Design a protein with these regions (language model features):
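Conserved N-terminal/central alpha/beta ligand/cofactor-binding core
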Residues: 20-121
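Conserved small/polar residues in nucleotide/adenosyl-binding loops
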Residues: 127-129
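Beta1/beta-strand and adjacent pyrophosphate-binding region of the FAD-binding site
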Residues: 2-12
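N-terminal Rossmann-fold NAD(P) dinucleotide-binding loop
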Residues: 15
């Protein structure tokens, strides 16, 4: 049986960020996903940031996350929202090329030390060593 320091189940945005940070800290990390080709798949309105989310994206970036870095590599348009109002309510939004983002995220994860496992997590047994 293989030993991992961390096993992340699900490769959505949060799962990718969790696996990324664990890998950066040198932890042996496995990332389980049903379909590797779905890594980095964005919603139908692919954007990062905006009025309510710019601060969250910035915090993830400052803490070593990857979403903004991959977003910058995949952006097709940037806009600062609410410029007619004060700086306290400005929000940067990047429109993202969905296919390019997925391609860049897959490349990033596959060049890391994260072990991708294409499977389902059905029955978990935790063994303390």
């Amino acid at each position: 049986m293989e030993h991992y320091d961390v096993i992340v189940i699900g490769a959505g945005h949060a799962g990718l960020e969790a696996a990324n940070i664990c890998d950066k800290y040198g932890l042996k990390t496995a990332l389980i996903t049903k379909n590797q080709s779905d890594l980095g798949k964005l919603s139908c309105n692919p954007s990062i940031g905006g009025v309510g989310k710019t601060h969250i994206a910035s915090e993830v970036d400052i803490l070593g996350g990857v979403i903004c870095k991959i977003g910058d590599k995949s952006a097709i348009h940037y806009r600062v929202l609410n410029l007619s109002k004060g700086p306290a309510v400005w929000g940067v939004r990047a429109q993202i090329d969905r296919d390019l983002y997925a391609k860049n995220m897959q490349k990033y994860i596959k060049t890391s030390k994260i072990e991708l496992i294409e499977d389902e997590a059905i029955n978990l047994s935790l063994i303390h060593i």
